[in-house]
Amino acid sequence: SMTARYKHTIIDRMLQSPLRFATLPAWTTAVMGDFDRFLLDHATAEKKASGMAISMLSHYPDRTDLVTAMADLAIEELTHYREVLKWIHQRGLITTPDQKDPYVGAFRQSLRQGSEVYFLDRLLTASIIEARGAERFALVAEALEPGPLKKFYLSLARSEARHFELFLELAQKYLDHDMIAQRWDELLDIEADIVATLPIRAALH
C-alpha cells in the first residue's frame, strides 16, 4: 500500500546518515535475540541523554538558544525514558543499575581541551551519537513485527534524526563553519573506528 511504502521510505531515509560505518546485521540479530536486555540498556541510554542535555544547559547558561533547545531536549529524552519504562514493566522486568557505555566513553576521549574546541566537540559528538541512535532505532523498527513497539521505534528513529540536525544547527550558530566542517570529518572517522572495533551486544551501543 501507499502508506506502507511511504513508511518504508522514511526508514530508508533514517538509515542514510553521515555515519561512515554501517551497523552490521549481527547487531540487529543480537538485539532481537535478547530484546529484554536491549530494552533495559535502551532505558539507561535515554536517561543519560536527558542528563547530558541538562549538563549542557548548565555549562553554557549565557547561550540562550542552546539553553532553550537543551531544556526541550532534556524533557523529550526523559519522556522517551518513561515510554521505554512502560515496555520494561509490561514485560515484568526491573530496571538495572547504570553501567558505563563503552561507545560513549570511547567517543568522549576525543573531546579536546580549550573552551571553544571543547564546546565544538561536545556539539558534534552529540550530533553523531544521535545519528547512530537514529540508524539503530530504524534497524530495530525494521526487524520488529508490525504493531505498537515497531511504531514506537520508528518514532524514536525520527526524533533522533531531528536531534542529530539540532546539534549541527547549534554548532553552526555559535562556531566558525570551516572549523566545524574539518572537525566533523575527523569525528565521523573516529566514531566509525569505535563502532567497528567494539564487541556486538544486545545494547544500543
What are these regions (language model features)?
Residues 5-205:
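Non-heme di-metal
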